Design a protein with these regions (language model features):
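Zn-dependent metallopeptidase/amidohydrolase metal-coordination segment
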Residues: 6-19, 72-76, 340-391, 396
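Acidic/His- and Gly-rich active-site-bordering loop/insert found
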Residues: 3-84, 103
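Flexible, glycine/charged-enriched surface loops at secondary-structure junctions
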Residues: 52-54, 111, 166-170, 220, ...
């Protein structure tokens, strides 16, 4: 695989959404995400490939004349979190292009294409894997209208504003699907292994918890007469952490990543608060227990603090087990390439989890420096991306031989 070509691509993409304080911001359906798609389309054109958009704005990269043929498909996403890293998602799309470039250069008789998905991150609209979810039918129009940015724009509106018509197409023509991704954890980095063959993907359950107390003067209101919404929320934040810790044996985690306080003034007792809580794991029952513990904590806070509380599940999906034939082929490919590897589960969600219920799917993880991701400090080596691409291509060859 041509790591030098990969480096040129990353260099050209680097200015898009570059944040002066570090990292890149390429949120879904913004000009920055558009810029990523346009630039990657130009890479494909230079190699002689053709591109097409679907009803959600996902980009399909094919060999000329092979647009409608069943293909071994590689893909990931091009959007980012605010001040995120260069490699999250992007490495997987460019690895797909790298595989296609080698197939073309060596004139291999393999039908392969690459898909770049829109809106994998939930940062702007609170709904993850939207591009892949729309074209697989797991995310509907109602879901898109419920998902809104802080400005009040729905995800459906954002899609339509770009000229897309979600709900009018379905993903097809896929023999199997493979996604390369940085691990976003420290396992491979600390073990020194080059490849993680993913067996299952954890699924997130997202909760919105609301707390309505009484807004009062912070100096004139005695401590025993307060109905502090933020204090009630704080109890739930710690309860969520305890819930995650109690399920560590099942690899379940719980995170409070969003806190909104009203009015948010130093001399005012908070009258209202809202939390965004993320619970995820590969064991459905374990996730359910953690969510139940958080619900119980909310009821307890409501009773003890005289604050009205509510909880809403904003999104939920089941953990996904990946295809054993694809897993075995990627394991065999790693051995064939002489690489140290391991089987592992993914704690983060990925587009592959939307594809897996419909088509045989697998994932390849590569290390990222110190396990850091969703951060300006995110880093992976070009050589590791190229090695991962080589494993995907060898996996395709193995599956073709054993089909």
């Amino acid at each position: 695989m041509d790591a030098g070509l990969l480096g040129e691509w990353f260099d050209e993409l680097a200015p898009i959404g570059a944040d002066p304080s570090g990292g890149v911001t390429r949120l879904a359906y913004t000009p920055e995400e558009d810029g990523m798609f346009e630039k990657v389309a130009s890479f494909a054109a230079r190699l002689g490939f053709v591109t097409a958009e679907d009803c959600a704005g996902n980009m399909h990269i094919s060999f000329p004349g092979g647009e409608d043929a069943p293909c071994h498909t590689i893909g990931s996403h091009l959007d980012s979190v605010p001040r995120g890293g260069m490699y999250d998602g992007v490495a997987g799309v460019l690895a797909g292009l790298l595989v296609m470039e080698k197939v073309r250069r060596l004139r291999l008789s393999i039908s392969v294409k690459t898909v770049a998905f829109r809106c994998e991150e939930s940062s702007l609209f609170g709904l993850a894997t939207a591009g892949s979810g729309v074209v697989t039918g797991s995310i509907g129009i109602h879901d898109l209208e419920r998902a809104k940015s802080a400005s009040g724009q729905s995800l459906g509106e954002a899609m339509k504003k770009k000229g897309y018509n979600p709900g009018t197409c379905r993903l097809g023509g896929i023999i199997d699907f493979t996604e390369l991704h940085i691990e976003q954890g420290r396992v491979l980095w600390e073990s020194g292994e080059k490849i993680g063959v993913v067996t299952a993907i954890a699924a997130p359950t997202r909760l919105k918890a609301t707390f309505l107390g009484r807004q009062d003067h912070s100096g004139a209101t005695p401590m025993d007469l307060r109905k502090d919404a933020l204090c009630a929320a704080a109890e739930v934040i710690l309860a969520a952490e305890r819930a995650g810790r109690s399920e560590m044996g099942f690899a379940t985690v719980a995170t409070t990543g969003v806190i909104r306080v009203t009015p948010g003034a130093l001399n005012v007792i908070p009258g209202a608060a809202e939390l965004g809580i993320d619970v995820r794991g590969i064991d459905k029952e374990s996730v359910a227990r953690a969510v139940a513990a958080i619900r119980e904590a909310i009821l307890t806070a409501e009773g003890s603090r005289g604050v009205r509380c509510g909880i809403e599940v904003t999104s939920a999906s089941d953990p996904v087990t990946l295809n054993e034939d694809v897993i075995e082929s990627l394991a065999a490919a790693s051995e064939k390439c002489g690489l140290a590897w391991r089987r592992m589960a993914s704690g983060a969600g990925h587009d592959a989890m939307k594809i897996a219920p419909l088509f045989p799917s697998g994932m390849v993880f590569i290390p990222c420096r110190e396990g850091i991701s969703h951060s300006p400090a995110e880093e992976a080596s070009l050589e590791d991306v190229a090695l991962g691409a080589e494993v995907m291509l060898e996996g395709i060859k193995i599956r073709r031989e054993t089909a």
